[in-house]
Amino acid sequence: MKKAMLLALEDANLTPEAIGYVNAHGTATEVGDIAESEATWLVFGEHIPISSLKGHIGHTMGGCGALETWMTLHMARENWFAPTLNLNEVDPLCSSIDYIKDEGRQLDVEYMMCNNFAFGGVNTSLIFKKSG
């Protein structure tokens, strides 16, 4: 997961500080969420706003990357990012990052990252730039 995010940053010729929001894969599985939060913290530190959209749309299997990309781009255009639904309490084993929970958040970001992590290490991290 960490490697996928770092390679995406390298391909985009960006530093972690350039990213204003991360759309987490966030499947609400103990092992997956702990691993993803740790990898995200290692790349971005504790101040990166992050949420998962699966609580809004479910896990659409092969379609989740495309749907979450579209939703992330839409949220960026609106300068408002949705919270992770039903995230009332963060697992203490998850890393301390800026989870968007309870209510959405107004954010004006230039770059955002969408992550999808699958069984067997089939991982993608895509970076998008907000259109003018």
Please provide the spans of the model-predicted regions.
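Conserved "HGTGT" condensation-loop signature of ketosynthase/thiolase-family condensing enzymes
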Residues: 1-132
